[in-house]
Amino acid sequence: MAELYMARTCKHGVLRVVGGDPWEHSGEILITPANNRLSGREGMDALIHAKAGQAMTDATRNICLEQRKVNAPPCAVTTNVVTSPFDLSDRFTHVIHAVGPDCRRPNQDEQRRELLPETYANIFARIHELGNVRTVVAPPISMGVFAYPHREGAKLTLDIILGHLDADEHPGFEEFLLVVKDRNFIMNMRTVYRENEDQFPGMDTTGA
């Protein structure tokens, strides 16, 4: 069983921060941290593509080709596309390929505090559009090869997801599994959670 680092229950559902790899879990939605070319060649995105099989890479390549026909970028920062889970269909119904801010790029790094919330807002809108979702499984967006500063990013990620689960409108899902493996990110998330626990929406249910 995956290690549970944190659980917090809000008005409409629960955020659980768990260890392991995303494909070890299951839910209606798997989110992969894509790049703007949808190439499936970097970091966690490459690992998810490998688990889902060549058909996923073929699907995202076809999306890119269709976008280029109309002179549009394959998938601009903050936006997302949806594919089948292909070889992961025993665990998931849809895969959302979401492009968060790439902090290796100075222009995106400067705007990262605005771009990351917009990325999640577009993910949440897509989940509503898909419907019939109970569980969302995702690694923390932009915290891997895109080099978002972990301490800032950990707090912002918690703020965004918990705020959505505690908003007046139903979020469109009941459980968000944030799957973490990077030890530095885990350490920073634990620190910001401990320091700001009374400011986050909801109630801690880690030991429940």
Where on the chain are the PLM-derived regions?
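Macrodomain-like recognition of ADP-ribose-binding/processing modules
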Residues: 1-208
